[in-house]
């Protein structure tokens, strides 16, 4: 099974961009991740078993591309996270605060939060994507939740 590249881009562009943004915390780098991921899909010669296989493959490629960017020694001028945040419409102030808290997490925590809660991946699927065992994924999710709980607890209790 091979789906037209334009259709794949239209279907998965937001998801792949979100993976890049979650890991790199920079919209320009996230855009690079998305472009490189879709370019790799376009030139990939083998067929996929299903749409789920395509989705999983794209996520894996995006994660690896983001890791490649993280390994670079130099940084170019980047759009600040604050500037990017100003372009995102949030329904409630708590949504923006939660998003900022997730983005402030170290990437090893933010990526598991993103894949689990925003992409609906299972623990097993996240473990496969990140090349971790399921226990490590559970620990990272637990630690990320605890950090978020501590960060948000004070602010959200003040609003009640």
Regions found by a protein language model. Name each.
Residues 18, 32-39, 52-64:
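Structural recognition of an alpha-helix C-terminal capping motif at a helix-to-coil junction
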């Amino acid at each position: 099974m091979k789906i037209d590249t334009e259709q794949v881009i239209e279907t998965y562009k937001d998801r792949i961009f979100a993976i890049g943004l979650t890991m790199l915390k920079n919209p320009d780098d996230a855009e690079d991740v998305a472009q490189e991921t879709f370019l790799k899909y376009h030139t990939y010669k083998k067929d996929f078993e299903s749409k789920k296989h395509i989705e999983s493959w794209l996520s894996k490629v995006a994660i690896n591309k983001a890791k490649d960017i993280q390994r670079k020694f130099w940084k170019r001028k980047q759009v600040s996270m604050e500037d990017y945040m100003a372009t995102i419409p949030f329904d409630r102030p708590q949504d923006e605060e939660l998003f900022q808290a997730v983005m402030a997490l170290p990437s090893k925590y933010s990526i598991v939060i993103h894949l689990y809660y925003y992409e609906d991946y299972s623990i097993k699927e996240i473990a496969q994507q990140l090349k971790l065992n399921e226990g490590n994924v559970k620990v990272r999710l637990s630690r990320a939740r605890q950090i978020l709980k501590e960060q948000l607890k004070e602010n959200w209790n003040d609003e009640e």
